[in-house]
From Swiss-Prot:
GO terms for molecular function: DNA binding. It holds the Pfam family Response_reg. It comes from the Bacteria. This is Transcriptional activator protein ExaE. Keywords: DNA-binding, Phosphoprotein, Transcription, Transcription regulation. The keyword Transcription regulation applies.
Amino acid sequence: MGILLVDDHPMIRLGLAHFLGEGLNGLPVREAGSGEEALQQVQEELPGLVIMDFDLPGISGLETTRRLRQRLPQLRVLFFSEHTELGLVRQALDAGACGFLSKAAAPAVVLEAVRRVLAGHAYIEQPLATQLACQPHPGQGGGNARLQGLTQREIEVFLMLAKGTPTRLIAQQLCISAKTVSNYLTLLKSKLQVSSHAELVHLAIEAGLLRIAA
């Protein structure tokens, strides 16, 4: 199973398809220019991942995602959009998306996100995930209230740990030592009143930052 790109701009589809094909060792990449075309293509051949834009002619990317997930709950959708307002990010996740990227994301981040979502994980671009953690979600439980007591760096470490990022990679990406990451983990468990990594993941899901894999 390959990837289906859903975007109404042919040049964006062409460039992204070429980039992903090279970066993912020739994984097949198909294209759709509208929500209706995406629904038809998925019906004909199930992809491993749908990369979705918000703005589409006809039915929107959000509505397309809802329809796809209603028909195929196991289908994984990653939003790739120039619109990064937190309300829209939450709408995408509520519609069933497994991740969200801005079109301004670095190429390496795009590849990482696609690989992680294909592997069954959730992925929200780091700046967006941090903003989501800091802003309460109407109707959510107490997850966000606890997170608001964290510093910016603690939120970054928390989100990376919750997404399953190895300690070594967290240290590299944040330019700190592995020992410092371990210290942050101990501090986070104390501040958030959890005792295990599984509870950290549960808290991230409760706060609306991660979705349970379908």
